[in-house]
């Protein structure tokens, strides 16, 4: 595997910076309901909740979609991957989360880089864009998953609430897990899709009717 260049690393840092306008800050992935329900009450339970999502839910599956989109040999294959990714959304809000972030990512990336990118949900858009721009697959998946994890930690910091130091400790602790999941999932294919983060999925469904909330999901 070729060593990533500084330009490639900095491009990924730009894509997954909070400054990149995909609106990730607006989504809690169901965490807001889990706090409301008393399932997440402190740093320990927040880290456990996020770990489950990474290992057994969207974290794992999104890396599969990134890898498959990166390797897609035709536009029809890419469309099929995108359809599968949308079908794996556990609730209407989860579908909205991946679709709207995907639309935003496609729009800004196609405007800044000369790539044909439109109509894709978030992980599929990332995989396709990484291929078109010539970015390394493994590093792209690691950056994506780390940004997803860090966004959930930021949400937990606001919702539980957690201290800034506790939040940064969780990010530090989960960074090796993000690397390990991405390394494994990006070498797999869509036959390895699975989802057993049931409490997180139920939380995403419950959030749709939550009375008072800060996040869109």
From Swiss-Prot:
Domain of life: Bacteria
Alphabetical keyword list: Chaperone, Cytoplasm, Nickel insertion
One cellular component (GO) term of this entry: cytoplasm
Keyword Repeat: no
Subcellular location per the Swiss-Prot or TrEMBL entry: Cytoplasm
GO molecular function: nickel cation binding
Family: Belongs to the UreF family.
Quaternary data: UreD, UreF and UreG form a complex that acts as a GTP-hydrolysis-dependent molecular chaperone, activating the urease apoprotein by helping to assemble the nickel containing metallocenter of UreC. The UreE protein probably delivers the nickel.
General function of this protein: Required for maturation of urease via the functional incorporation of the urease nickel metallocenter.
Name of protein: Urease accessory protein UreF
Species annotation: Ruegeria pomeroyi (strain ATCC 700808 / DSM 15171 / DSS-3) (Silicibacter pomeroyi)
Source species taxonomy: Bacteria, Pseudomonadati, Pseudomonadota, Alphaproteobacteria, Rhodobacterales
Gene: ureF
């Amino acid at each position: 595997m070729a060593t990533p260049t500084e330009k490639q690393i900095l491009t990924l840092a730009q894509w997954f910076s909070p400054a990149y306008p995909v609106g990730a800050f607006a989504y809690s992935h169901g965490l807001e309901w889990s706090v409301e329900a008393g399932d997440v009450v402190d740093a320990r339970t927040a880290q456990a909740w996020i770990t489950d999502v990474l290992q057994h839910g969207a974290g794992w599956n999104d890396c599969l979609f990134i890898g498959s989109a990166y390797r897609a040999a035709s536009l029809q294959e890419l469309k099929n991957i995108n359809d599968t990714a949308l079908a794996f959304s556990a609730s209407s809000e989860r579908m909205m989360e991946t679709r709207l972030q995907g639309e935003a990512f496609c729009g800004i990336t196609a405007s800044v880089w000369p790539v044909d990118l439109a109509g894709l949900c978030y992980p599929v858009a990332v995989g396709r864009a990484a291929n078109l721009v010539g970015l390394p697959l493994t590093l792209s998946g690691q950056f994506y998953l780390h940004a997803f994890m860090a966004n959930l930690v930021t949400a937990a910091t606001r919702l539980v609430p957690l201290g800034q130091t506790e939040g940064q400790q969780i990010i530090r602790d989960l960074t090796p897990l993000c690397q390990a999941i991405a390394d494994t999932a990006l070498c797999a294919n869509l036959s390895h899709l699975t989802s057993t983060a049931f409490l997180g999925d139920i939380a995403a469904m419950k959030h749709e009717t939550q009375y008072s909330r800060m996040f869109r999901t």
